[in-house]
Amino acid sequence: MSEKKTVRVALVRSPIGTRESHRATVRGLGLRKVNSESVLEDTPAVRGMINKISYLVKVL
C-alpha cells in the first residue's frame, strides 16, 4: 500500500479585506482563525488553492 502525501498549511494573515473568492478558498482549505492549521491531501487542486492565497498562508 502506498501512503498518500499530505501538506500542512497554516493561516498566517487574516482574510479580512481580501477578495471574496480568496476568503472562500481559505474556508475551502479548512482554515478558520489566524494560526489555525490544516493537513490536506497533496493534490494539484489543493496546490492551486495554496498558490492562489499564498500571501495569507504558510506551508509547514
UniProtKB/Swiss-Prot annotation:
Keywords: Ribonucleoprotein, Ribosomal protein
Protein's UniProt name: Large ribosomal subunit protein uL30
Subunit structure: Part of the 50S ribosomal subunit.
InterPro entries: Ribo_uL30_ferredoxin-like_sf (IPR036919), Ribosomal_uL30_bac-type (IPR005996), Ribosomal_uL30_ferredoxin-like (IPR016082)
One GO biological process term: translation
Cellular component terms (Gene Ontology): cytosolic large ribosomal subunit
Family statement drawn from the similarity comment of this UniProt entry: Belongs to the universal ribosomal protein uL30 family.
Gene, per the UniProt record: rpmD
Presence of the UniProt keyword Ribonucleoprotein in the record: yes
Molecular function per GO: structural constituent of ribosome
Superkingdom as given in the UniProt entry: Bacteria
